[in-house]
Amino acid sequence: LIIGTSGRYEFKNKGIDVFLESLNRLCRDKNLKRDVLAFVNVPGWVGDPREDLQARLKSKDKFDTPLEVPFITHWLHNMTHDQVLDMLKYLGMSNHPEDKVKVIFVPCYLNGRDGILNKDYYDLLLGQDLSVYPSYYEPWGYTPLESVAFRVPTITTDLAGFGLWVKSLKKQNGIDGGVEVLHRSDYNYSEVADGIKDTVSLFLSLIHISEPTR
């Protein structure tokens, strides 16, 4: 399963913090049977694309040893003070081969010329199975709207204008309908993290049900 979040580097407002927390909880869930690849597509103080990663991508060999700092596609000018990297370290996430959840942090603008992915944002969005935008503050929020427009189911919150609009439709909403709107407040960070984890798990079960038997 490929999931992802994106947007400006507003660590709390965009819900990047709670997204990472949910990934950590999902990784520790013993009931998780499928691999999850989670992208954090958020432009940071980006430096150069990683030459060691470029070399591996060009090589026809297979590698079983992780690179140094196995989360990141491009070096940052503030490697020791980046909030995403700091939180991944705090959570103890490491992208070990045995981990069911692995995180890829893409800290550059996706314009098709970044030197690693060389895809624009919408190409990457189309490659995802699910998007997550757990905003703490968002007057409207185009990212979940764009996700749905590209037929990629999304998770958002009722602190985003788009999430409030979906709830106002008074129709049954949920991830099986394309949009899961989680309640978010100043005091329910942990509940939101669990809500994301549980919604991803539910989505995995829906995919399993819809898959043809072999």
Which ranges hold each PLM region?
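Acidic donor-binding loop of glycosyltransferase active sites
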Residues: 122-139
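Short hydrophobic beta-strand element within catalytic cores of glycosyltransferases
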Residues: 153-157, 162-163
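Short glycine/serine-rich donor-binding loops of glycosyltransferases
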Residues: 141-144
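Conserved catalytic-core segment of nucleotide-activated headgroup transferases in glycan assembly
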Residues: 1-122
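Donor-sugar nucleotide-binding helix/loop cap in glycosyltransferases
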Residues: 147
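Residue-level detector of conserved catalytic or cofactor/ligand-binding positions
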Residues: 207-213
